[in-house]
C-alpha cells in the first residue's frame, strides 16, 4: 500500500525530465520507459542533469561542446535520397543554359527547332530541250493542243523525257499560243479602225478612168450637134448630163440686148498662137491640119448663124 501522497509523487516523478528512469516490474534495467529513452536523450546531456548553481557559464559551454548538435528524432540509419534527385541537385545551375527537364532543342534562346522551321522550297532546274525534242514536241502540238495522257506518255518515251516535263511543256506552249492569238486579233482590230482608214492616202485612180471622168474644155471637145451656139462659147458651161435633151436656155438670153452684145463675140477671131521657142517648135512641130482648129471655126460660124436666125423673128415682127 502506498501512502496517500505517494501516487501523486510517483506521477510527478514519472513526467519530470530529472526523475530516475522507470523500470519495468521485473527489474530488468535494459527495458527503460523513461521520457529520455523515448526522446533519445542520453545521460551525458547537460540539460537532463541536475541544476549546477556553481558551474557558471564555463560549465554550460563545456556541456554544450560535449553534447554537440541536438537531435530531436531517434537515431537511425538515414535513407539516401533517390538517385534521380541526387543527380538533379548535384548539377550546378546556370541561367544561360537549358533546364535539365527540357529537351536540347527547346532552350531559352527563342530559336525554333528544325521541325518548326519552314522547309526551303526545292528549286527545280530548267529542262534543256534538244533540237530533236523540240521538233517532235512542236509536231505533236500541231496535231493536238490538248493531248491525252497516253499520247503524252508515248511522246515522252519517244523523246526520252519524263511525262511530267512533257505535260508542263504543253501547258507553256498553249499559253504562248493564246498570247499570239490575242496579238493577232488586236492587230486586225487596229487595221480595221476608222482612224487608220481615214489617215491612209487614197489610192490613185487609173489614168484611163480619171481621164474619162474629167470634163474636157468646150473648145477642145467635138463639135456640138444641133447648133447650140451659146453653149459652145467659152463663157457658158454646158448643161449637166443629167438634164433632159429638151432643155432650153432661159428666155432672157433671147432678148435683143443680149443678142446684140453677143454679136461681137462671134465676130472675134481665134486667139493669137503662143510664141514658142525655136527648139520647142522644132521638137514638137504644129500640125496645120489639126481638127481642133477647124472645129473651133465651124463652131463660131454655127453660133453666128444661130444668132442671126434668132434675130430674124424680131425683124419680121
Swiss-Prot record:
Keywords: Developmental protein, DNA-binding, Homeobox, Nucleus, Transcription, Transcription regulation. A motif (OAR) lies at residues 294-307. A motif (Nuclear localization signal) lies at residues 300-304. Residues 122-181 bind DNA. It comes from the Eukaryota. InterPro entries: HD, Homeobox_CS, Homeodomain-like_sf, OAR_dom, RAX/RAX2. Plays a critical role in eye formation by regulating the initial specification of retinal cells and/or their subsequent proliferation. PANTHER family: HOMEOBOX PROTEIN, PUTATIVE-RELATED, RETINAL HOMEOBOX PROTEIN RX. Residues 108-118 have a biased composition (Basic and acidic residues). Belongs to the paired homeobox family. Bicoid subfamily. CDD domains: homeodomain (cd00086). It is found in: Nucleus. Residues 44-127 are annotated as: Disordered. One of its GO terms (biological process) is positive regulation of transcription by RNA polymerase II. GO terms for molecular function: DNA-binding transcription factor activity, RNA polymerase II-specific; RNA polymerase II cis-regulatory region sequence-specific DNA binding. A motif (Octapeptide motif) lies at residues 33-40. It comes from Gallus gallus. This is Retinal homeobox protein Rx2. One of its GO terms (cellular component) is nucleus.
Amino acid at each position: 500500500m502506498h501512502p496517500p501522497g505517494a501516487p501523486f509523487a510517483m506521477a510527478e516523478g514519472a513526467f519530470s525530465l530529472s526523475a530516475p528512469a522507470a523500470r519495468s516490474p521485473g527489474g530488468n534495467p535494459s527495458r527503460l520507459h523513461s521520457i529520455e529513452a523515448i526522446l533519445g536523450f542520453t545521460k551525458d546531456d547537460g540539460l537532463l542533469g541536475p541544476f549546477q548553481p556553481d558551474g557558471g557559464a564555463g560549465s554550460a559551454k563545456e556541456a554544450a561542446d560535449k553534447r554537440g548538435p541536438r537531435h530531436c528524432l531517434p537515431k537511425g540509419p538515414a535513407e539516401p535520397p533517390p538517385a534521380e534527385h541526387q543527380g538533379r541537385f548535384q548539377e550546378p545551375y546556370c541561367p544561360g543554359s537549358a533546364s535539365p527537364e527540357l529537351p536540347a532543342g527547346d532552350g531559352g534562346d527563342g530559336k525554333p527547332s528544325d521541325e518548326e522551321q519552314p522547309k526551303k522550297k526545292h528549286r527545280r532546274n530548267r529542262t534543256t530541250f534538244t533540237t530533236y525534242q523540240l521538233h517532235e514536241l512542236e509536231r505533236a502540238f500541231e496535231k493536238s493542243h490538248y493531248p491525252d495522257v497516253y499520247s503524252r506518255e508515248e511522246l515522252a518515251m519517244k523523246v526520252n523525257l519524263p511525262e511530267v516535263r512533257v505535260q508542263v511543256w504543253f501547258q507553256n506552249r498553249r499559253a504562248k499560243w493564246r498570247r499570239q492569238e490575242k496579238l493577232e486579233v488586236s492587230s486586225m482590230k487596229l487595221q480595221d479602225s476608222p482612224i487608220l482608214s481615214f489617215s491612209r492616202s487614197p489610192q490613185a485612180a487609173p489614168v484611163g478612168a480619171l481621164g474619162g471622168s474629167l470634163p474636157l474644155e468646150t473648145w477642145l471637145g467635138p463639135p456640138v450637134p444641133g447648133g447650140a451656139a451659146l453653149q459652145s462659147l467659152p463663157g457658158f458651161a454646158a448643161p449637166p448630163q443629167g438634164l433632159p435633151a429638151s432643155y432650153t436656155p432661159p428666155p432672157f438670153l433671147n432678148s435683143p440686148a443680149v443678142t446684140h452684145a453677143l454679136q461681137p463675140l462671134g465676130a472675134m477671131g481665134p486667139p493669137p498662137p503662143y510664141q514658142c521657142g525655136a527648139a520647142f517648135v522644132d521638137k514638137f512641130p504644129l500640125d496645120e491640119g489639126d481638127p481642133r482648129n477647124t472645129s473651133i471655126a465651124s463652131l463660131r460660124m454655127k453660133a453666128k448663124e444661130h444668132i442671126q436666125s434668132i434675130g430674124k423673128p424680131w425683124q419680121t415682127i
